[in-house]
Amino acid sequence: MQKYKVYINNEVKIVEENWQDFCSKFIMVEAAGGLVFNKHGDILMIFRNGKWDLPKGKLELGESVEECAIREVEEECGVSGLEIESELSKTYHTYNLHESDILKNTYWFLMTTESEQKLTPQTEEGISDVKWCSEKEVEDNLNNSYPSIIDVFNSL
């Protein structure tokens, strides 16, 4: 039986029961995002709602997960010239929105860019900062992040 790792209120739950039954309790949201390296080996991170995070967002109708991941990184960070190198992982986390329980399934991709343009946070999405982070900065930032984001880094 396949096991699924789901973050509920930032606590891990391993779902071994029927996955479809578990999912039926939630509104499912498909999303995609990127762990992006620049040519200097720095990693792109965003600061949203008081936490360090990676750029990601919801799939639009007719869009592939790869297209979504690139679009979301571009929109949330103002970066261009993105190339997908590989798929990294999938994460699952729940949240409550307007009294509805949501289960977000996020597809994560390893990306690179040669771009050195000025980064621009998408403030209307609650993003107050976007920056290229050294390995040490990433380590520090992950102390104020989400467990699912730490999982993405661990999948490298």
Label the predicted regions.
Residues Y7-N9, N38, F47, N96-L97:
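Acidic surface patches and DE-rich sequence motifs
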Residues M1-G33:
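Acidic, metal-coordinating catalytic segment for phosphate/diphosphate chemistry
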Residues N144-L156:
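Charged phosphate-binding loop/patch that engages nucleotide di/tri-phosphates or the phosphate backbone
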Residues C23-D53:
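Short, contiguous, helix-prone interaction/anchoring segments in small proteins
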Residues L59-P147:
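Unchanged
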